[in-house]
Amino acid sequence: FVSVPVIIAAKSLKIPSIVHESDVTPGLANKISLKFAKKIYTTFEDTLNYLPKDKADFVGATVREDLKTGDKHRGYQLTEFNNDKKVLLVMGGSLGSKKLNDIIRQNLETLQESYQVIHLTGKGLLDNSYVGTKDYIQFEFVKDDLTDLLAITDTVISRAGSNAIYEFLALRIPMLLIPLGLDQSRGDQIDNAKHFESKGFGKTILEDTLTENELKTQLREIETNRDDIIKQMQTYKESFTRQDLFQKIINDALSE
């Protein structure tokens, strides 16, 4: 909502503004800003269905440039893992998810039959009783080393924020998405997750249906269909390079 007064002020000063919607369905701030903005760009093509045709353009996602520079050797050093077994990365979002953390730990022995597990728990949610456990390592949060961990990741369990899931897509990492529920959000992550599942990029479990059995079932589905999922991911191409998008912003802002 911080952007709304800025967009309104820009309009009053006759300064053109362009807003961006990263989720499938537009949020309230962008719905308000749209009345004063010249254009709105969307990450998802389906978002165009919710917006006026004369103002909305689909531009896709432009992921950060360093994403594909992760070092596998460094990733294995950080985790003390190896390439003998697949790596499962579990990300519960910046605040973590107690429910997801509990289910991962309760099913750790089963998961370890197929995976080495990197568990990003969220701040204050480490469990010291698991320190030193074979094929399992936990971090509260990882920033600078995340690209190295992604470089060794075969499958990811994650929330469904658009930036994160497009990064997994760019890296061709099959994903099991557990979006924030309606009790914690407006449902944007649910829409994002369902969209990605419909494209064949992975599977979705709603948080209120997250159980041990459902987790095992969906991970099994992903592994059974891994090759098909990756093939589907390979059909995705970025709509704009960073330079092309920069030029589009200039052209749209200056056009009459």
Role assignments for model-derived ranges:
Residues F1-L13:
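An aromatic- and histidine-rich active-site surface loop
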Residues R74, F81-T155, I190-K194, I205-N213:
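Donor-nucleotide binding loops and adjacent catalytic segments primarily
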Residues F139, A151-Y166, I173-P174:
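Acidic donor-binding loop of glycosyltransferase active sites
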Residues S158, P174-R186:
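Short hydrophobic beta-strand element within catalytic cores of glycosyltransferases
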Residues K199-D227:
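C-terminal "capping" alpha-helix adjacent to the active site of nucleotide-linked donor transferases
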Residues D227-S239:
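A short, well-ordered alpha-helix in the C-terminal region of glycosyltransferases
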